[in-house]
């Protein structure tokens, strides 16, 4: 130190100490902020902090890229840190799921007797479902108990109580908060153990490798749900990032950010949220615009998250499955669900719909689920009359199937499809709105199967009758829902008659007209079902049922009755920015797949300097649309 101070002011030695102190003054708060959980600032793809976090992860990953065991352990630890920054102490639940599913999965594989394998598989599925149901459906079951017996019990958060005692936290014990992404990683864990039981995959040998599979941070909190047979083999491959793959990854990230910020967040903060919060303050047209805008918002939000997740994973050398395939190009509700949230839809197909009998027959599981869902409906309604109505409906179905044996396969197939859709609705939340949303999607699929088998003349006549009867009922009762159904069936029969008339003159463009028409009808139907989906979202579980139902009812009322025809032009002009963003988003969505593939490859094939410049420009444009408070991704709540 003396040599260092030669020729310097006598105060110099203290200068070094002061610098060290100042450095610590900055470093300690920085580390505290970095490693502390802040519920108001979760780690999101839309935050600059996330990209700083990912830059560190990516840099370290390139240093250990060929040391597979270390890489997997590092990414597992990184994923746990990511989840901790998103959900705090709930990371312990994720760790519990990793431990439980890893060891029981190993036991399933080692069991020699089939009944032991099945018993262990059932045990692990029950464990995963109990974890999910405790956090997601506690309010629902306690409310149902009170409605039917008058016994009033309150939720108690055992995990929060244990956390307070062990770690000195101050979490509320009388409130249960849904951990982010719990529905996704529990489903992923269940599919892993079920696939081991079915002999489809081998159990993972190393718990760190399995933990990495179950918690991989890009897709942890909102999917896509990754199957072990597709992802686990990637755990043991060396890291390799070709130049074009790097370009494709950057493209997906920028594409996802543009969807989320320019489309989804802009529509939500500037119009959609305001209308859904207070629908009675807006006209029927404004409610309708908000509903259609929400259809684009939820797609841009969810597929935007998936695009970013795919891009981030690709930069680290891992491929995630496609989760969306231009769903608003679907020609029917059934096709829509093949294109929307593909990883969840295929999960329902493989682990619920097909085991129930699929399109072959009914099984004991079919009747169990129909009975269980009927019980759920009775609990939600709090009325025995709902149970009587459902009982009479199932009695009618049973008598019809008995009298017409040829129809049994059709009935059971559609019962399985309906059960799957309603369970899917209930997976999103325990309120009437999600049950109705799932039921409407199931009804749409069943109705479409019946409808397309009928002749054009029959469809023309039936659509006119449905339109006329809905219009007459609305005229007599002023019940808003009949105005909406009259409008839908009016559009339907207008289209059918237009096609019939057009065929009299030319068949040249009939296929294109048919495709455009069915895409439009499907989009309108799916958009209407979203009314019940959005109304039930982002609510306190303790009051979700009442608030969601009132929101949906008020919006239906406004859309069915609150129209001022002389002000339509003025109202539309007031919201021209929203309409233009919606139209632009839909036009981009409807661009043919081949063209999208070409400009994706063109971006990835650019020289690096040009790619950097174009990426910087895109980021600058995206930044102009960012609001002060970024909206959380919609599917975080599930």
Segments predicted by a language model, with ranges:
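A cross-taxon signal for low-complexity, glycine/charged-rich
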Residues: 1-8, 18, 373-378
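Short, low-complexity intrinsically disordered segments enriched in A/P/G/S/L with frequent Arg
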Residues: 10-12
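Aromatic (phenylalanine/tyrosine) cluster motif
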Residues: 14-16
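Membrane-embedded transmembrane alpha-helical bundles that form the catalytic cores
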Residues: 22-637
């Amino acid at each position: 130190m003396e040599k260092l101070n030669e020729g310097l002011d006598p105060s110099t030695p203290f200068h070094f100490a002061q610098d060290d102190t100042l450095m610590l003054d900055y470093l300690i708060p920085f580390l505290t902020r970095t490693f502390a959980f802040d519920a108001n600032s979760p780690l999101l793809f839309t935050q600059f902090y996330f990209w700083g976090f990912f830059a560190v992860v990516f840099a370290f990953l390139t240093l250990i890229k060929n040391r597979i065991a270390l890489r997997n352990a590092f990414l597992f630890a990184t994923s746990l840190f990511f989840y901790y920054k998103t959900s705090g102490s709930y990371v312990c639940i994720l760790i519990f799921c990793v431990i439980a599913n890893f060891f029981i999965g190993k036991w399933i594989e080692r069991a020699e007797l089939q009944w032991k394998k099945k018993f262990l598989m059932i045990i692990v599925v029950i464990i995963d479902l109990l974890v999910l149901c405790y956090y997601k459906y506690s309010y629902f079951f306690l409310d149902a108990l009170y409605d039917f017996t008058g016994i009033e019990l309150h939720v108690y958060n055992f995990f929060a109580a244990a956390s307070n005692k062990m770690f000195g936290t101050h979490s509320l014990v009388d409130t249960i908060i849904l951990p982010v992404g719990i529905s996704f990683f529990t489903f992923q864990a269940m599919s892993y153990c079920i696939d081991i039981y079915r002999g489809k995959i081998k159990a993972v040998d190393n718990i760190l490798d399995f933990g990495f599979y179950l918690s991989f941070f890009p897709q942890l909190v909102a999917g896509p749900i990754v199957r072990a047979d597709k992802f686990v083999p990637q755990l043991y491959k060396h890291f390799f990032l070709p130049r074009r793959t790097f370009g494709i990854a950057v493209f997906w990230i920028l594409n996802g950010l543009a969807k989320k910020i320019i489309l989804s967040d802009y529509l939500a903060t500037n119009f959609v949220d305001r209308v859904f919060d207070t629908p009675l303050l807006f006209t029927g047209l404004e409610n309708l615009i908000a509903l259609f805008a929400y259809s684009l918002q939820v797609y841009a939000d969810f597929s935007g998250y998936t695009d970013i997740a795919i891009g981030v994973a690709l930069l680290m050398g891992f491929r995630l499955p496609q989760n969306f395939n231009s769903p608003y190009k679907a020609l029917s509700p059934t096709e829509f669900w093949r294109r929307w949230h593909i990883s969840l839809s295929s999960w329902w197909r493989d682990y619920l719909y097909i085991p129930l009998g699929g399109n072959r027959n009914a099984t004991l599981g079919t009747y169990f689920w129909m009975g269980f869902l009927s019980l759920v409906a009775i609990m939600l309604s709090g009325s025995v009359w709902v149970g009587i109505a459902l009982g009479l409906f199932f009695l009618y179905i049973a008598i019809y199937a008995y009298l017409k044996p040829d129809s049994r396969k059709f009935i059971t197939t559609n019962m399985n499809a309906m059960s799957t859709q309603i369970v899917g609705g209930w997976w999103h939340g325990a309120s009437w709105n999600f049950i109705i949303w799932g039921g409407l999607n199931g009804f749409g699929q069943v109705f479409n199967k019946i409808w397309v088998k009928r002749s054009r003349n029959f469809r023309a006549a039936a659509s006119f009758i449905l339109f006329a009867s809905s219009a007459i009922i609305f005229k007599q009762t002023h019940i808003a829902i009949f105005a909406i159904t009259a409008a839908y069936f009016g559009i339907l029969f207008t289209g059918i008659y237009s096609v019939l008339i057009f065929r009299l003159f030319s068949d040249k463009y009939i296929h294109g007209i048919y495709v455009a028409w069915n895409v439009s009808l499907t989009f309108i139907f799916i958009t209407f079902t979203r009314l019940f989906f959005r109304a039930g979202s982002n609510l306190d579980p303790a009051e979700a049922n009442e608030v969601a139902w009132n929101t949906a009812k008020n919006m239906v009322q406004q859309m069915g009755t609150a129209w001022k025809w002389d002000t339509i032009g003025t109202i539309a002009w007031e919201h021209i920015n929203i309409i233009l963003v919606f139209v632009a988003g839909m036009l981009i969505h409807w661009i043919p797949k081949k063209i999208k593939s070409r400009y994706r490859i063109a971006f990835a094939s650019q020289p690096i300097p040009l790619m950097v410049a174009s990426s910087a420009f895109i980021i600058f444009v995206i930044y102009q649309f960012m609001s002060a408070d970024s909206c959380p991704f919609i599917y975080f709540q599930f």
